Regions:
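Aromatic-Pro/Gly-enriched surface loop or interdomain linker
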Residues: 1-55, 86-90, 109-111, 195-197, ...
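A glycine-rich, often tryptophan-bearing local segment used as a flexible ligand/cofactor-contacting loop or short
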Residues: 57-140
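Alpha-helical scaffolding within the catalytic cores
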Residues: 38-42, 67-70, 170-176
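Solvent-exposed, acidic/flexible segments
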Residues: 15, 19, 65, 69, ...
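Catalytic beta-strand/loop cores that center a nucleophilic Ser/Cys/Thr
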Residues: 102-201
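Extracellular/periplasmic catalytic domains that process cell-envelope and extracellular macromolecules
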Residues: 5-7, 45-47, 76-77, 170, ...
Length: 219
């Protein structure tokens, strides 16, 4: 049994991309989950959600998301939390984040690569689960890929990590990035949580729980 806490009564709207098991994990965590279909995205009431999350590569797969992305930015400005899982270069065809940003080729392929938390008092690392060394143990395949690259200074990097071998040198940023916008927040997650969830990696569930709990985090 995993030791993972989640804030109560979190409503998540999920925009399916290429397909991942994160929605199942969110339901296991106790979130109230709806799948956001094209009509919902165009004119449905998004204010009933605490969090809107996009599946992996959703900007490539979902024409409606590209067309109605402004609705996600409005949702964040009004106090919502938007969580965007990794995208490929399709994300760079327009400005889909609240400020200019581009997905780059940044990745960390060693699943045990050391991770440094850059903003330790950020609620994503403290509420309701405390993120520490053990969070990063037992990962599979990689830490993440298609990190956010060039970006407006209003985006804040929350993590840095570094592959321990010479063919991918240097500290990598862009794996977990937040921008505050209006009353809410917009986050980009290049971390491969979608890859860890089927492998039942407890640390990934803790991070996922903290991400969706952000709207209820103590101010």
């Amino acid at each position: 049994v995993m030791n993972v806490k989640v804030a109560p009564n979190i409503r998540v709207g999920f925009i399916v991309g290429a397909g991942d098991q994160v929605p199942t994990a969110l339901e296991q965590l106790g979130a109230k989950l709806d799948f956001i279909e094209p009509n919902d995205l165009a004119w449905g009431d998004l204010s009933r959600y605490d969090v809107i999350m996009t599946g992996v590569r959703a900007y490539e797969r979902r024409k409606d998301l590209r067309a109605y992305n402004r609705r996600l930015l409005d949702f964040a400005e009004r106090g919502g939390t938007v969580i965007v899982q990794y995208n490929k270069m399709e994300f760079n065809q327009a400005q889909y984040g609240p400020y200019p940003a581009r997905v780059g080729a940044g990745r960390v392929t060693d699943e045990n690569a050391p991770v440094k938390v850059l903003v330790p008092d950020h609620p994503v690392f403290t509420f309701p689960n405390t993120i520490g060394e053990s969070t990063w143990r037992g990962w599979v395949q990689e830490r993440g890929l298609y990190f956010l690259g060039e970006k407006d200074p209003k985006y804040v990097d929350l993590l840095q990590m570094e592959d321990p071998f010479p063919d991918n040198p240097g500290v990598k940023l862009g794996s977990l990035v937040e921008a505050r916008t209006g009353k809410g927040r917009w986050l980009y997650v290049g971390l491969g949580l979608w890859r860890q969830v089927p492998a039942e990696v407890e640390g990934a569930y803790q991070l996922l729980a903290n991400l969706i709990s952000l709207p209820k985090a103590p101010k």
